[in-house]
Amino acid sequence: MDFQIIALDIDGTLTDDRKKISSLTLETLIEAEKKGIRLVLASARPAPGLFSIRDQLKMEQFGGILMSYNGGRITDCEGNTFYEISMDLATTRRILRFLEKLPVTVIVDDGKMFYVTDKNGYKVEYECRNNQMQCTEGDNLADWLTFSPIKLLLAVDPMKIYEVQEQIRNFLPEDLTVVRTAAFYLEIFPRRINKGQGLCDICRILKIDVRNSIAFGDSENDIPMLKAAGIGIAMKNAEMDVKKASDMSTLSNNEDGIPYALRALNVI
């Protein structure tokens, strides 16, 4: 098959457990770009959290695409936005007041800055460092927020995450969803946002048949993308539901699973 796009989840997929891209994975993906295959970084992260990886992969040189916020915002590597979908501000405020009752740390961003009620909250420093963004603190997010966010990020004790997710799911209006994006993260965003729709939209923009795409992922939020792609590939370290939704599995993110699969498919 003539593959023209490789869509890549970041954490637990493209990067290893140290948040690094291995030299073999880097070399293989740049080799794919030199063959004319476009890379798509498909992440729950805000766009600034993708910039370092974009630069390592030389994506600007080869026309790569950034899919941030699980597909809530799609841009080219120069920062030009193809589209963006955000939450309603009044609804967001109601949700924030509800979340005050739950054991979660809420992190909101506008693409440039994180907004929290406690800079020392669970995973706040980790998230700021990982995305290379600054953080500002205030007393009450529900009253303080003045913009419509694309998503709400919730850091949760992994032992409580399924229980908390169910409580939130029962509260949310029909047009919003809550998804696990890591063992300790939940994200709330518009239901029409998902990586699968994002991949389809990118293919439409680039005039590429989505069947000519490969996608790699490991988490629940990757499932729509793995189903939408011509070939969806789950990492060995993926959740079982992700593996069931994929066409095939590969080695883990610590074992160069991406190069292994691309060579098995004769892409490289």
Residue ranges and their predicted role:
Residues 46, 70, 111-112, 184, ...:
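A generic "binding-loop/recognition-motif" signal
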Residues 23-123:
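Active-site phosphate-binding/coordination module
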Residues 57, 62, 70, 171-174, ...:
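Short, structured coil segments at secondary-structure junctions
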Residues 1-5, 22, 187-268:
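Mg2+-dependent phosphoryl-transfer enzymes with acidic/Ser/Thr/Gly-rich catalytic loops
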Residues 2-18:
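Asp-based phosphoryl-transfer active-site loop
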Residues 36-40, 62-64, 151, 211-212, ...:
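Short active-site oxyanion
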Residues 25, 50-54, 164, 168, ...:
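Hydrophobic packing residues within well-ordered alpha-helices of enzyme cores
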Residues 98, 102-216, 237:
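Conserved acidic, metal-coordinating active-site core of Asp-based
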